[in-house]
Amino acid sequence: MRIILLGAPGTGKGTQAKLITENYNIPKISTGDILRENIQKKNTIGKKIHNILKNGELVSNRIVCNLIGERIQKKDCIHGFLLDGFPRTQKQAEYISNLKIKIDYVLELIVPYELILKRICGRRVHTPSGRIYNINYNPPREEGKDDLTQEKLTIREDDTIEIVKKRLENYEKNSFLLNKYYLREKKLKKLQYFKIDGKQSIYKIQREIKMMLK
C-alpha cells in the first residue's frame, strides 16, 4: 500500500502518519524528518537546508526530490510506504510518477489557517525523543518540561507566527496545482483521492481513514 498524506503545516499529518504506518506496518517517509536529519549532520546540504527553513522558505524541488528518491528505493519500501509532507508541488508529484511508482491513495487533511496558527505556535518539542506537546491542547504536566525525562522543551526555530504565516502562504501557492493534478489522476482511475476534515478529533480522523483504506 503506497499512500501520500497531504495537508498544510499543522494539520496533524504527523500524528495520522504514525497511526497509519503502525496499523499497516509500512515505513513513514517524512520530508521534515529527512530534512532535519541532514541539518543535524551539519554537512553542506544540511547547512543549506537550515538557512532556507529558518526563513520560512521551501527547500528546492531538486534537493527534496533527490532525498526522497533515495529513501523510496530502500528495501523496506518494497511492500509500501507513506509519504508525509511530499509532494508539495506538481513537479514533485510528477517526479514520483516518473519513478514508475504507483500511488494507491492520496489523503488530504483540511484545517482552517486560524486553527493551524494556534496549533503550531503552541507547539513544544522534546528534541531527543521527538515527543510533541501543545500548550493549548496537550500541555506537559509541568510547564516547559518533558513528562518522562523532565528535560527542557523547546520551540522549533520555524514555529514563530511570522514564519508559520509564510509557510502557509507557500503551501497555498503550490497546493492549487497539486490538488488539480491528483483530481485528474483520480478521474483517470490511477489512484483514490480523499479530503478529510482535520478539525475532528484524532480518533475520528483515524476511523475515517481506516474506512477509506479498506
From Swiss-Prot:
GO terms for molecular function: adenylate kinase activity; ATP binding. InterPro entries: Adenyl_kin_sub, Adenylat/UMP-CMP_kin, Adenylat_kinase_CS, Adenylate_kinase_lid-dom, P-loop_NTPase. Pathway: Purine metabolism; AMP biosynthesis via salvage pathway; AMP from ADP: step 1/1. ATP binds at residues 10-15, 123, 132-133, 200. Residues 122-159 are annotated as: LID. Catalyzes the reversible transfer of the terminal phosphate group between ATP and AMP. Plays an important role in cellular energy homeostasis and in adenine nucleotide metabolism. Monomer. This is Adenylate kinase. The lineage of its organism: Bacteria, Pseudomonadati, Pseudomonadota, Gammaproteobacteria, Enterobacterales. The gene is adk.
